[in-house]
Amino acid sequence: MNSSTFNVQTLGKSTLKSPIQLGYDKGDGIYNYIKDEERILYEKNYTSILKDLKEKKTPISFEKAGPRENIFFEPSKTKAGIVTCGGLCPGLNNVIRSIVMELYYRYGVEKILGFQYGFEGLIGKYNHPYIELTPEVIDEIHLYGGSILGSSRG
């Protein structure tokens, strides 16, 4: 592993202004955009990080997730997909519901697909139909356990 192991490839420069209105100043009570250069360290051991720095190595890190000020895709022309994998966990329907609500109401994405039964739902030979996820479909799913999409392992 080296410092480029977890780099995320991009499709091009993000030139569209994000439709969500966030802050720029820490401590103003408004969630801030994430800058592209923000990273999360892979290694949590202080001694290991110091060793990398002394050897003039860039510590291994992940791109920090979160909303960006500029985005690549035009939300009104975007289709989004959600898939749940690796088994069930508490609150999965809450996560699905939150993603749909954020995409639909904050970003303006109108076509959101839910792929059933984990990665199998992405493979045509299994013939698992996708579910069109709208605010109406997901309105009360947080009241139920499991995942509206199902899941699979392996």
Predicted regions and their residues:
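Metallocofactor- and cofactor-centric catalytic cores in central/energy metabolism, strongly enriched
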Residues: 1-154
